[in-house]
């Protein structure tokens, strides 16, 4: 199997921006829990000498540079102030980032649990954390109208719909991430954010 790499490109695959990295797996693919993948085997294997230090340096470099899967343009002074206002309205409540996904993506078909749509993910987060500040970030391919997964009433379901935001800025302002199978969940784990898979 071949899939976009975790650090894909500077732009969207749906806009035909070529990938800078690919995952090639001769056994399965990382998002399919029904089959073992080469990545799973590598993770289960002992690290080579110096492997832990190398991984720590790579993690620090990724976080320090702010690179993400798509590396979209950074925004967000206005959005940072909107989050601050929401925090003032709901003191002590966490900001939960909900990354939207392309709903016909193979990762959802093969890797998601009961929650399989962006709308259901927002509703699940609200049900389990009624007082939290829910920030929904549509997937950039969906936002561009290139793939399915739109949530027309997202502004009613979430406290803020964060369009045009890059993953790095979104993670910096969030306390938690709730996802189905989004790579942004992996980026959140790298950043040691509380991450929930649904």
Where are the regions that the model predicts?
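Catalytic-core helical/loop segments in enzymes performing group transfer/polymerization on anionic/lipid-linked
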Residues: 1-198
